[in-house]
Amino acid sequence: MALICSISNEVPEHPCVSPVSNHVYERRLIEKYIAENGTDPVNNQPLSEEQLIDIKVAHPIRPRPPSATSIPAILKALQDEWDAVMLHSFTLRQQLQTTRQELSHALYQHDAACRVIARLTKEVTAAREALATLKPQAGLIVPQAVPSSQPNVAGAGESMDLGELAGMTPEIIQKPQDKATVLTTERKKRGKTVPEELVEARGAQQVPGRSPRMWGLHSASIPGILALDLCPSDTNKILTGGADKNVIVFDKSSEQILATLKGHSKKVTSVVFHPSQDLVFSASPDATIRIWSVPNASCVQVVRAHEGSVTGLSLHATGDYLLSSSDDQYWAFSDIQTGRVLTKVTDESSGCALTCAQFHPDGLIFGTGTMDSQIKIWDLKERTNVANFPGHSGPITSIAFSENGYYLATAADDSSVKLWDLRKLKNFKTLQLDNNFEVKSLIFDQSGTYLALGGTDVQIYICKQWTEILHFTEHSGLTTGVAFGHHAKFIASTGMDRSLKFYSL
């Protein structure tokens, strides 16, 4: 039954009831009446707006007026209904399109979140594995304190939270001197004779039967081999460091990867083979030097000698100590057995980052390259800078001592290689290369007969005449490492194209 307003006798849009008379009114009309009279219109009893009680009913559908009974009126009513339906349909389509876009955006966000979660899970797993590797060595990583008496050597107050230095004891100082005496005696016995087994250069050719691409090592998604070294006792064993943060030991004779060593958190820029033990060494911009066991494919020692990127690495002739350089301006001398940093030195007068470091074959002196184009020669015993070789322009990229003990080759970002006589402390030859030629690696063969350089391409020079005899352009990217096999029977090179190539003289 429909409610009827007692005032208008029509169906009210907003019905309410008066508790005074129990009659139903249209709220709009009864409020006006109360405002004028203040009483109920039926029994004239006092009544206020607050006393009115709303009645909740379904929205009333008013009957069509008599005019809707004609055909034109019906057609107009149908047209109005059609317009209303179309407008409602259009609104629904707009809402549907908006909902679809929101759903698509939400799905993309969900997919991205899943990818991030997967990546973080992988990183956490890798970090846990690295932590498990480090835990057994935790007691050896931080050196014990032994005060240093040298004013320019980083001591307890200058250790930069890397631990105090173990110090250079008399026994440690004596060991390199004894080794140098033996090596000098052996060099004198050999004299200037060239080994009979040494290969003579006949012309540039690749090792027979090998594809020009040779072996692709390291990750294809993060391409680039940044460091190369050959085992001195077995040059068939190749050591490489890559942009993928890994170190790989490769056997040339079996064409097999012997070990993949993972642990660095950044790219590997320097690698060194131990001549007599199954150990290899690697350095990285993550400010660590890692010592690896090849048979176990595991890290046995982490040396934290620097605060900045480690830029150079060289093993002492005794096989017991490592020399490292860093862009924190220090070079460090560390014990590989204990992981202790024995001493750290910086040239306070220059205050410049070091770019590379290399021991002299005798091990009593060594050289470092700097960002300001200087080559500095250091005395290991006194830990003092004994000579400087200026002349380059641009950061020093590589240095190499000849096995004869007299020659030093240096390269910089000036497209030149300079040869220095260590007896006279002067530059006696400059190999001027093509403009924009980059040199990333220098090395003499074991006899001191050949000099190889790698960079824009690979070039081989014969010493004394200092003329180019071979030129290889096989790498599709920059050559980052070059090395000689035993008696120069082959040449190995690595590059940013992640390939390892071998050539014969």
UniProtKB/Swiss-Prot annotation:
Residues 1-73 form the U-box domain. Its main location: nucleus. GO terms for molecular function: ubiquitin protein ligase activity; ubiquitin-protein transferase activity. Pathway: Protein modification; protein ubiquitination. InterPro entries: G-protein_beta_WD-40_rep, Pre-mRNA_splic_Prp19_cc, Prp19, RING-Ubox_PRP19, Ubox_domain, WD40/YVTN_repeat-like_dom_sf, WD40_repeat_CS, WD40_repeat_dom_sf. Gene3D superfamilies: YVTN repeat-like/Quinoprotein amine dehydrogenase, Zinc/RING finger domain, C3HC4 (zinc finger). Keywords: Cytoplasm, Cytoskeleton, DNA damage, DNA repair, Lipid droplet, mRNA processing, mRNA splicing, Nucleus, Repeat, Spliceosome, Transferase, Ubl conjugation pathway, WD repeat. Its EC number is 2.3.2.27. WD repeats lie at residues 220-260, 263-302, 305-346, 349-388, 391-430, 434-473, 474-505. It catalyses: S-ubiquitinyl-[E2 ubiquitin-conjugating enzyme]-L-cysteine + [acceptor protein]-L-lysine = [E2 ubiquitin-conjugating enzyme]-L-cysteine + N(6)-ubiquitinyl-[acceptor protein]-L-lysine. It is found in: Nucleus; Nucleus, Nucleoplasm; Cytoplasm, Cytoskeleton, Spindle; Cytoplasm. GO terms for biological process: DNA repair; mRNA splicing, via spliceosome; protein K63-linked ubiquitination. One of its GO terms (cellular component) is cytoplasm. It is an enzyme of class 2 (transferase). It holds the Pfam family Prp19. SMART domains: Ubox (SM00504), WD40 (SM00320). The keyword Transferase applies. The keyword DNA damage applies. Belongs to the WD repeat PRP19 family. Homotetramer. Component of activated, catalytic and post-catalytic spliceosomes. Component of the NTC complex (or PRP19-associated complex) which is associated with the spliceosome. Interacts with KHDC4. Ubiquitin-protein ligase which is mainly involved pre-mRNA splicing and DNA repair. Required for pre-mRNA splicing as component of the spliceosome. Core component of the PRP19C/Prp19 complex/NTC/Nineteen complex which is part of the spliceosome and participates in its assembly, its remodeling and is required for its activity. This is Pre-mRNA-processing factor 19. It comes from Gallus gallus (Chicken).
